[in-house]
Amino acid sequence: MAPSPTPSHSRRLDKKKFTHVSSEEIARGEHMSLAKYKYVDATGSQKIWEVAERCQKPKSTESDSVCALPILRRMLKYDCLVLVKQYRPSMKAFTLEFPAGVVEPQDGTSEVSALRRLNSQTGYTCTGLKQTSPLTASDPVHTSCTTKLVSVEVNGDDLRNLNAQQKFGEGEFYEVVQIPMNDVLQRLNDYSEDGYVVDSRVYAFALGLSMGAQMGARRT
């Protein structure tokens, strides 16, 4: 596929001129470490960047974390986006997020890990695996962490989901939140006004839904 065109006013970057030189760990905790990366930029100058790294990294080409995007479908009810509410010490606040987590060695693939996280955090069982993203950056400014997004369908009328049960690990606390698909953006804004911090991926998803609906309305 041909690359997307670059507008005439934009600088063009030569990928060959940017090179990673070395990594040096300068601090290490139980789950995260801080490293100093040396790299060469387009001018040929050597620069330093501080990067947070995950201590547990996958040995394969899989991402080090996954994020499930579940849509709950039930007879005679609105389709709902399934999120989890939890307290995040780093934010000093409660957040609204997609079911997500680190890929464990026993998972094997991102899809298996995403379905396991969905089931443990929400109690729901996936009834339709839709799409898996390529490797994406979690926060490319500050960390080397990567994630894959896995979109899934949950049949709420399935017996397993009628009897859904969360499976918490030690120190884990999740509350399931179901938001009608026709009102996601407004509901997230309401949660934000109430002091919740919405994960940027969730909000970007909601914006995409809203923009898609507006563009579709203009064409009709």
What are these regions (language model features)?
Residues M1-G44:
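N-terminal presequences and immediately downstream first alpha-helices
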Residues A2-P3, T61-I71, L76-R116, P134-A137, ...:
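Conserved Nudix-box catalytic region and its N-terminal flanking loop in Nudix hydrolases
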Residues A2-P7, R11-H20, F94, T143, ...:
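Nudix hydrolase/Nudix homology domain
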Residues E24-E25, R54-Q56, P134-D139:
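Short, solvent-exposed loop/turn elements at beta->coil junctions and helix N-caps
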Residues I26-L69:
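Acidic, metal-coordinating catalytic segment for phosphate/diphosphate chemistry
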Residues V40-T43, D139-N161:
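Active-site-adjacent beta-strand/loop module that shapes the phosphate/pyrophosphate-binding cleft
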Residues T125-S133:
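A short coil-to-beta-strand element that immediately follows conserved catalytic motifs
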